[in-house]
């Protein structure tokens, strides 16, 4: 990108304006700058910056399978959007209940603990089939049950290790696109439209 920008600037007979430099740094039309894709078969999440893979994380989706029915405890599939990030600044393992910190810190792999911890990404469905995602309280969130990552173990949400969701939330902004695909993670050129 820098070489293209440098070449573009060199070809100009005038000094580039700040607006011209900003527009040269924008992604191609229709490519979301931040994107999260979750491959349920592999129990992995890949984050993309302008269709370029940035990082992969282990996740855990629902132990009850995939679907969009209220009360099913299924992980919804399809396109969604991050609406809000909750918990910035909380220490790893900080328990959240009703999207509010409780003051309790749950240790990693604490026996019998199945809490929402560290950060919560509130999602809304962007398709007819998953439009109820927000009303179903389906989130991407931290889990103390890190020993269950890479296997379906959640009650519908997408779980991550506390250190991973902290890192994700440092990069991700509201408005980022999230795709949950039932199969394997697609290559970048085959991402859902």
Where are these regions (language model features)?
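Soluble periplasmic/extracytoplasmic beta-strand elements of cell-envelope proteins
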Residues: 35-39, 44-46, 58-60, 81-83, ...
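Exported/periplasmic cell-wall-interacting domains
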Residues: 26, 31, 69-71, 90-193
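A structural motif detector for short, solvent-exposed N-terminal "entry" segments of globular domains
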Residues: 23-66
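Sec-dependent N-terminal signal peptides
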Residues: 1-6
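Electropositive
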Residues: 58-86, 90
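A generic structural signal for short beta-strands and their flanking turns/coil linkers
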Residues: 55, 76-80, 117-119, 136
């Amino acid at each position: 990108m820098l070489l293209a920008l440098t070449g573009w600037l060199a070809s100009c007979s005038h000094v580039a304006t700040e607006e011209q430099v900003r527009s040269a740094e924008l992604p191609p039309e229709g490519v979301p700058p931040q994107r999260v894709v979750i491959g349920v078969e592999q129990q992995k999440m890949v984050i993309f910056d302008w269709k370029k893979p940035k990082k992969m994380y282990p996740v855990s989706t629902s132990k009850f399978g995939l679907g969009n029915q209220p009360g099913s405890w299924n992980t919804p599939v399809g396109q969604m959007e991050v609406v809000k990030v909750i918990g910035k600044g909380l220490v790893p393992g900080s328990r959240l209940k009703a999207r509010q910190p409780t003051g309790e810190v749950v240790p990693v792999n604490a026996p019998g603990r199945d809490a929402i911890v560290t950060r919560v990404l509130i999602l809304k469905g962007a398709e007819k089939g998953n439009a109820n995602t927000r009303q179903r309280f389906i989130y991407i969130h931290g889990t103390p049950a890190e020993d269950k990552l890479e296997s379906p173990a959640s009650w519908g949400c997408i779980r991550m290790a506390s250190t991973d969701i902290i890192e994700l939330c440092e990069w991700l902004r509201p408005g980022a696109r999230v795709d949950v695909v039932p199969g394997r993670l697609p290559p970048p050129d085959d991402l859902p439209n």
